[in-house]
A protein has these predicted regions:
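N-terminal secretory signal peptides that target proteins for export/translocation
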Residues: 1-12
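Bacterial N-terminal signal peptides
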Residues: 14-27
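Noncatalytic scaffold domains of N-terminal-nucleophile
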Residues: 31-55, 59, 67-240, 245-289, ...
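Active-site rim segments in enzyme catalytic domains, especially the processed small/beta chain
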Residues: 80-87, 91-97, 101-106, 258-261, ...
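Short, small/polar residue-rich loop motifs at catalytic or cofactor-binding pockets
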Residues: 272, 399-402, 465-467
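Internal maturation/activation junctions in enzymes
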Residues: 308-420
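Extended C-terminal subregions enriched in glycine
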Residues: 411, 460-462, 495, 504-552
Length: 586
């Protein structure tokens, strides 16, 4: 009954399933060793946001490639078939588990601000103020992309196959064409889509400026050419032979052009970061550290819920759903004040997720909601905050953007990767076959006089983000779960809730990802997913003083979970993704 109501609430899912089943029924797939892993475990496992990306990853693994090789091949394909969400013009977080070395690391490839950045996105170079409504898209909204440098660094550290091999599936698909995906079609079908996506008219729209129907073959020769150059000449080729000039010309068109320079493009720094880890029940949950605020929120929420163990872990019970919402509010208040790029602000990340501090915050959760919560004061900030007024970061967008993938290879190495253009189709600039991000919108607007804004715009800085690739380990140090989600600011709620469902309630990823969503990503409200069991909580939560909205929530989750000697997994049924795997021959 639960799944029936879910599918009734998501009628477009039928279109997506038809496309997936058509891929599954092809002779090539029928003869392949791949199979769907929602219930049947596989030793090698992949979940991505599109079947062609999952298949590209599996091809690398079948050739003896590493989890990193598979993730790179999947990302290159996602830049084609899910170009609204991620690609070479975006930013990426990657978490990697080396099974032999028992070593966990993460790479930060977020888009960064150019060197010539102004004080804020709405501040022009002469100091005059610009209309915020006009600055969310276009050249000035774009950050220096970091996805390709991250992929190159990951391959240098953990890759096994040759660099050109990883590009073969995406080049072939870009050259020969791919079927218009249902989810991309849905996004392009917004009432103003043709006007808003003028750079993409020839690619995705017909002569009447209508979105090409689902299943229509889409060919992207510019993307194929870009990939061929990078595959043969290496990552630096993306800016060689006049490509950087073409790129800069594209972002300097239109209202308030980008301030990016060629030096910005060619000197992008990938950061290797220590993951942030904390306890939940008998597990150790490891997440992306700042500038991800997602990691801080997820660890705080999980620990606060553990402190409220008397309420159980059933999201269909109003008492627990209320506690989840209140924990989310508390965590959001803290992150808006204290999380920023650690190169520019001393972020008290470990103090914010320490059990003692989180226990204090959990004690604030009452039977009924409070009108508002103030931020806490972790011990690490006592001296730092003296005499200072910190400006809170703005709330993150609730747009259903971004993409998530997870991979486990034959050696047990694993990748969880969240990758984004920020909002769908980012800046709405298409250059060399890929979409450019609009990550500059993630910085805080201009602070008031006397305030310090940790997330303010500064040269060569990373804005905060909700993205939170995650890995979970048991008491023996064995990796048991990995994944993450798309979905804008609501990512933190999607990930937190599904970790509760998989770890506390022992649901499979397939069961967990089909549950209805609850979110407090936007201030002073609780959002419940329309058409799901979560929406039925509205009356009970209203009685507890919550301001409730029942809305569609297209997440974009992807998780893998250990099952015996293999892995089961799922991609979010709200989008086009699939989770497949295979068992290597002895």
């Amino acid at each position: 009954m639960m799944f029936q109501s879910f599918f009734t609430a998501h009628p477009r899912l039928g279109q997506r399933l038809c496309l997936i089943f058509s891929l599954l029924s092809t002779a090539a797939f029928a003869q392949s060793p791949y199979f769907e892993i929602t219930q049947k475990p596989a030793q090698v496992a992949v979940t991505t946001a599109h079947p062609m990306a999952t298949e590209a990853a599996l091809k690398m693994l079948q050739q003896g490639g590493s989890a990193i090789d598979a993730a790179i091949a999947a990302q290159l394909m996602l830049g084609l078939v899910e170009s609204q969400s991620s690609g070479l013009g975006g930013g990426t977080f990657l978490m990697h588990w080396d099974a032999a070395q028992k070593s966990l690391t993460s790479l930060d490839g977020l888009a960064i601000s150019p060197q010539k950045t102004t004080a804020s996105l709405t501040t022009d170079v002469d100091g005059s103020q610009l209309p915020s409504a006009s600055m969310g898209r276009g050249g000035r909204s774009a950050g220096v992309p970091g996805t390709l440098p991250l992929l190159a660094k990951a391959h240098a550290k953990f890759g096994k196959l040759s660099w050109p091999t990883l590009f073969v599936p995406a080049i072939e698909a870009a050259s020969k064409g791919f079927p218009m995906p249902a989810y991309m079609h849905q996004i392009l079908s917004a009432p103003t889509a043709a006007k808003d996506h003028a750079d993409m008219l020839a690619l995705y729209f017909d002569d009447a400026q209508k979105v090409k129907p689902v299943g229509t073959l889409i060919v992207n020769p510019d993307y194929a050419k870009t990939l061929q150059s990078i595959a043969l000449k290496g990552p630096s080729a993306i800016w060689a032979d006049g490509a950087s000039t073409d790129f800069l010309a594209a972002v300097q068109r239109g209202y308030k052009p980008s301030l990016m320079t060629e030096e910005d493009l060619k000197s992008y720094p990938v950061e290797e970061r220590e993951p942030l880890c904390g306890p939940y029940l008998r597990y150790r949950v490891c997440v992306m550290a700042p500038p991800s605020f997602g990691g801080v929120v997820v660890l705080q929420v999980l620990q606060m819920l553990a402190e409220k163990s008397n309420l159980g872990t059933d999201f269909n019970q109003p008492e627990f759903a209320h506690a989840f919402a209140e924990a989310g509010k508390l965590a959001q208040v803290d992150r808006r004040l204290y999380v920023a790029d650690p190169a520019f602000f001393k972020v008290p990340a470990k103090a914010l997720v320490s059990p003692a501090y989180v226990k204090q915050r959990a004690a604030l959760i009452q039977t009924n909601t409070l009108p508002s919560y103030g931020p806490g004061l972790p011990e690490a900030m006592l001296a730092e905050s003296s005499g200072q007024t910190l400006a809170q970061a703005t709330a993150a967008s609730s747009a259903d953007a971004t993409s998530q993938l997870a991979v486990v290879d034959a050696q047990g190495n694993a990748v969880s990767m969240t990758t984004t253009n920020n909002l769908n189709f980012g800046s709405r600039i298409l250059v060399q076959g890929y979409v450019l991000n609009n990550a500059m919108t993630n910085f805080t607007t201009s602070p008031k006089p006397g305030e310090i804004a940790p997330n303010k715009m500064e040269p060569r800085k990373r804005p905060v983000t909700s993205m939170v690739p995650t890995m979970v380990f048991d008491e023996a140090g064995q990796l048991v779960t990995l994944g993450g989600s798309a979905g804008g600011g609501q990512i933190v709620d999607y990930v937190s809730a599904n970790l509760v469902r998989m770890l506390a309630n022992q649901l499979s990823p397939f069961e967990a990802l089909a549950q209805g969503h609850i979110s407090t990503a936007l201030p002073n409200r609780v959002q419940l997913e329309k058409g799901t069991s979560a929406a039925q909580l509205a009356e009970a939560l209203l009685a507890k003083g919550q301001k409730v909205e029942v809305v569609p929530m297209n997440s974009g989750m992807g998780f893998l979970k250990r099952a015996g000697n293999g892995w089961i997994g799922s991609a979010d049924p709200r989008r086009d993704g699939v989770a497949w795997g295979f068992n290597p021959k002895p």
